[in-house]
């Protein structure tokens, strides 16, 4: 493990336009390390991210390639989360369209070992009658078995 807490995000070329804005807002309020999983970003964006001013919580390997994963876009998320579970004791995935307005480190206080922390997606639940969860922010401690099941199910279908 390289750290006790870690924030992660990821994007491809279709959603990378939000990344500089996201990183700016995240770093303005937080010092916990952030890693970005490359789901198919352009070389220009990777260069732009690598040229951002370094801060005390930056790390030389901020961008992590996911070229070896066959799935596309969002479907790489569970694999990125699974890989990140080996990088820190507690991990929080946060989508790049989340507007970080303050320090959010206290999210790690809500983890339970081997469980995913997510909220119910009420609009989808109401629309479908089944229970849906929002995966825009997901916090976890360790490598929850449900995370491994999620990534394997996605790999089978994509």
Task: Say what each PLM segment does.
Residues 1-158:
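Glycosyltransferase catalytic domains, chiefly GT-A lineage
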């Amino acid at each position: 493990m390289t750290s006790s807490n870690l924030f992660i995000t990821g994007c491809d070329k279709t959603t990378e336009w939000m990344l500089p804005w996201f990183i700016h807002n995240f770093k303005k309020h937080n010092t916990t390390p952030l890693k970005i999983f490359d789901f198919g970003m352009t070389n220009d964006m990777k260069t732009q991210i690598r040229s951002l001013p370094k801060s005390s919580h930056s790390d030389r390997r901020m961008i992590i390639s996911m070229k070896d994963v066959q799935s596309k876009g969002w479907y790489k998320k569970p694999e990125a989360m699974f890989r990140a579970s080996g990088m820190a004791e507690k991990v929080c995935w946060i989508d790049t369209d989340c507007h970080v307005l303050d320090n959010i480190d206290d999210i790690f206080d809500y983890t339970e070992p081997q469980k995913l922390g997510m909220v119910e997606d009420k609009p989808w639940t109401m629309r479908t009658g089944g229970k849906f969860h929002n995966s825009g922010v997901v916090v976890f401690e360790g490598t929850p078995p449900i995370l491994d099941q999620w990534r394997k199910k996605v790999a089978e279908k994509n």
